[in-house]
A protein has these predicted regions:
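Conserved catalytic core of the tyrosine transesterase superfamily
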Residues: 1-237
Length: 240
């Protein structure tokens, strides 16, 4: 609308003044990212059903614990692991180290033997490979795997995706007391301002927690009687 009135004033000279010139458009509020609650994340892990369980379980565990992007997960190679860390190649080919917690290490220990047992393994370096072709998983295939796992857990109608699992990892870390700068490094964000969105999520939860109090709707309770109020005033004078 502002552009239309600007055009009418400057190009066709139909107006002498732009009535929208001093109207501020404001800054649109960013939508809070969707994420699984801790209970939903546990249910997801407990209800994975797959003909290659070890691989799919490991994928979900990595998303939920490392907060990596889909593109980062599918490019992981066996040579990217060193001790209890994994080298992740992020946007702009920038590398970062992420530590593997106990859950990630356990998932990896169960998956690697199952991967090695494949008879048709072709991409020798790729961590996550197809059981059918032996080649590195594509982004689309991982999306399907995540969708199937969510469906098995009854979470398929909530708009979740691999990127939502990344949001889940960051949110649960923040709720667990992890420093924002540490989360920034784990996620591979350029600026901490990008990571700040997770503080808004927590503030919203704090508000909801207070409003959930059974006393939240009691409102203002007036004195039961004027006599009771007067007696309290008299007692207060005694102590002066």
């Amino acid at each position: 609308l502002k552009g239309f009135f600007h055009y009418m004033c400057t190009q066709v000279n139909k107006l002498t003044a732009n009535p929208t010139e001093n109207i501020s458009l404001g800054t649109p509020q960013k939508a809070l990212p969707k994420y699984l609650t801790e209970n939903e994340a546990v249910e997801l892990l407990k209800n994975i059903q797959s003909d290659f369980y070890e691989r799919d379980y490991c994928i979900i565990v990595f998303f939920l614990n490392c907060g990596m992007r889909l593109a980062e997960l599918i490019t992981i190679n066996l040579g990217d692991f060193k001790d209890d860390t994994i080298k992740i190649t992020g946007k702009g080919n920038k590398e970062r180290l992420v530590y593997l917690n106990t859950a990630c290490q356990a998932a990896l220990e169960h998956y690697l033997p199952a991967r090695a047992a494949l008879n048709n393994l072709r991409d020798k370096e790729a961590l996550f490979v197809s059981k059918k072709t032996g080649r590195r998983l594509t982004a689309r295939r991982v999306e399907q795997i995540v969708a199937n796992c969510l469906k098995s857990a009854g979470l398929d109608n909530m708009g979740y995706s691999p990127h939502k699992l990344r949001h889940t990892a960051a949110t649960l870390m923040y709720q667990g007391g992890v420093d924002m700068l540490a989360i920034k490094e784990i996620l591979g964000h350029e600026n901490v301002s990008t990571t700040q969105i997770y503080t808004h999520i927590n503030q919203q939860q704090l508000k909801q927690a207070v409003e959930a109090s059974p006393l939240a709707d009691t409102g203002y309770i007036a004195p039961q009687s004027k006599a009771m109020t007067d007696s309290k005033q008299d007692l207060s004078l005694i102590h002066i």
